[in-house]
Amino acid sequence: MVFMFMSCKDDNISSGQYDLEVEDFIWRGLNSYYYWQNSVPDLADNRLDSQKSYANYLSQFNANHELLFESLLSDKDRFSWIMSDYTALEKQLSRIYKTSGMMIQLARVGQSEDLFAFVRYVLPDSDAATKNIVRGDLFLSVNNEQLTVDNFRELLSSEVESFSIQFAQISGQTIAPTGVSVDLVKAEIQENPIHIHKLIELNNAKIGYLMYNGFVADFDNELESAFAEFQTQGVNQLIVDLRYNRGGRISTAIKLASMITGQFSGEVFAQTQHNDQLSSLNEDYLFEATAVQLKMDRIYVISSADTASASELLINGLSPYIDVILVGDDTTGKNVGSYSIYDWIDDEGNRNPRHTWAMQPITLKIANSEGFADFENGLQSDYRLLEDVANLGILGEIDEPLLEKTLEAMGVLPPKSKKNQLFRLKPRFEKMPSLQDAIMHTEIPTKMRRIRQTKDLAHE
């Protein structure tokens, strides 16, 4: 959600040493819209009772805007974030990256501080694609410097224009260098989240397979086209692969749910819950009447610990209406969403020209039509199987382990063994947290745009 935050420009405050405009923007935005506002003492309304005490409070952070933001977050919050450049934030929400095209996962080598990276998939037409880098490739170092828990962010930063990676391979219980290196160059790329869509025909079943890596509104037409193909092909079963999908726009999740079904148009898909002072903004999201309707009464979702936010909304929102079978790992457990909060200076959408900060704080909780939203520990998979870095397989091929397990669960492939039907592989290498933020956001209701104007900074 893009949110209009109205700063009080006539009442800009100062510590006497520097202007506190950004700090004021951060505090006011969280005070008004943060989901856990009433449980954070420093976000209490009485912080506004005295301009002097308020200014003294803000100035103690010494212009460290991230520190102020983080100090105002609830212990329950794993997902809010702030950026100094709102253009970068907008690009991130639209899956526009400065990248070589390698979409990677980091993992720890044994019990050491050393890390290695393995390639999950490669973006088409990227530099990595032209250098023949493929899913399953491993590397230990960047620019001949070993990846560690302390340096990986710097070495893999989007600010780095070009770099080299040194390939590695699994050797017993560790990772060993191969001596091969490749140079890569980054470019700005918008990822098409529809990574694969194809028809799988097995044992008289016509199965639509969609690997979908982000709920991005820019590609809604392409998503509809993919489902139109499924409908024309007469698919009677559906697999939605969300293993790498960290979320995105709520409106796209509603559109996808509506195309998967079609028989529930106008019924409640999800319900939002805001903080107490914004409870009037709680609303129901309804299934849409889409042109493409597969009318499924059961779907299979490939999931992982990186399946988050709008992905979980899709699963949870559909569950009261159809059977949703999860194959893979339990999901992230992000049952909350956010608005993009900017420092607007008027009703026309003009932003404060004196800074470029913007926030993506948690502002709402979202439940399904039955009011269920309590899955902070993730939605549990029905058939558990972790990706094995030593046996990743080729995405979209029926012998790729997670897709194969899904086809077994559907009954169109015989199970390889009884034991494997509910089996969780013990990983040899500990995965590190994802490099991408889990995101669920939506557009601004018009009635929210003027809320802050009546809550000006009080004077002594």
Identify the residue ranges that each predicted region occupies.
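C-terminal motif of bacterial Sec signal peptides marking the signal peptidase cleavage site
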Residues: 4-7
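C-terminal "post-core" interaction segments
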Residues: 209-210, 218-225, 229-230, 237, ...
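Flexible loop residues that form catalytic
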Residues: 144, 243, 304
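Active-site-proximal loop/turn and secondary-structure-junction residues that shape catalytic pockets
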Residues: 188, 244-246
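Flexible, low-complexity junctional segments that flank or bridge functional domains
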Residues: 9-237, 426-460
